[in-house]
């Protein structure tokens, strides 16, 4: 198990999709995270970076797609996603630059 010192190294990017936008209205945010990070590290990173209170973290490991190249077949890298639910009294995270909906 590797230790990740900086919380910003754990959170790689927000996931931008219709499903993630729908979940934002319910207080759940989706992030691409470092594949070696665990739920506790993700919770601490979100609380430190955004200054909010996290109630739960769900993670999903996704296999990279198999893609055809001119040299045969290749594979995109595997990713890990984290669905982070905030407490009801936390302020919303402004990761997309403005209010949703």
UniProtKB/Swiss-Prot annotation:
Q: What domain of life does the UniProt record list for this protein's source?
A: Bacteria
Keywords per UniProt: Ribonucleoprotein, Ribosomal protein, RNA-binding, rRNA-binding
BP GO annotations: translation
State the Gene3D superfamilies in the record.
3.30.70.330
UniProt keyword annotation of Ribonucleoprotein present? yes
Gene Ontology cellular-component terms listed: ribonucleoprotein complex; ribosome
A single GO molecular-function term is: structural constituent of ribosome
Protein task: One of the early assembly proteins it binds 23S rRNA. One of the proteins that surrounds the polypeptide exit tunnel on the outside of the ribosome. Forms the main docking site for trigger factor binding to the ribosome.
Indicate the family of this protein: Belongs to the universal ribosomal protein uL23 family.
Outline the subunit composition. Part of the 50S ribosomal subunit. Contacts protein L29, and trigger factor when it is bound to the ribosome.
Which PANTHER family does this chain map to? 60S RIBOSOMAL PROTEIN L23A (PTHR11620)
What's the name of the protein? Large ribosomal subunit protein uL23
Q: What is the lineage of its organism?
A: Bacteria, Bacillati, Actinomycetota, Actinomycetes, Mycobacteriales
């Amino acid at each position: 198990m590797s230790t990740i010192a900086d919380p910003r190294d754990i959170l790689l990017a927000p996931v931008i999709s219709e499903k993630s936008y729908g979940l934002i209205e319910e207080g759940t945010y989706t992030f691409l995270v470092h594949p070696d990070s665990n739920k506790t590290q993700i919770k601490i990173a979100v609380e430190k970076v955004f200054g909010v209170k996290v109630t739960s973290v769900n993670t999903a490991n996704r296999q990279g797609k198999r893609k055809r190249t001119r040299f045969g077949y290749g594979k995109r890298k595997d990713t890990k996603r984290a669905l982070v639910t905030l407490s009801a009294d936390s302020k919303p995270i402004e990761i997309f630059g403005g209010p949703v909906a």
